């Protein structure tokens, strides 16, 4: 509750000085997190007229201070995490937030244009040290060293042929709109065959030549996507 109160103050302050498009992150799979607590968080933030939510499942990485037996053992199991995710997706939909990607929900017209460029394999330009760009059909990387950046125009070509079919499939299946199998004519029959198997388990929806993951499918997206690339 203290965190919610702090977040509310920050959001109200941002709105008071003119910020109208605000995104909030939600963590799922926290120690002691119940559906009731998650519902409270979602509704409290929604009451603040937030336009965009990003929701992430907690993952404890190796070699971090959080990777201890006490913390690991306090976390919910996979079944409870699945219940939390599916509840969140349904609850946000009821509140008018459309899920457009595995971890992202928004009011109509407030989808992240920045991230959609990556997921749809569209071109973008990055500026400054460590920046990456996808421009004129090629990907570029600017070195991270500030002095080299200031004293040189050097860029490093990282990929001369980006936007492969596998990349489009991998990224496209992260989106709720999915992929159009007509865009992959040589794999169309195979895709339909695989999709029908997943459809039986309510993991994939097949509609108008599009294959798209369901909320349940998003929970095992890596395994499903690997079957298509």
Summary of predicted features, one role per range:
Residues 1-185:
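C-terminal scaffold of the Radical SAM
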Residues 82, 189, 215-218:
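An alpha-helix initiation/capping motif
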Residues 210-214:
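Minor-groove-contacting beta-hairpin "wing" of winged helix-turn-helix DNA-binding domains
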Residues 185-200:
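Short amphipathic alpha-helical interaction segments
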Residues 101, 199-209:
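A short, conserved structural fragment
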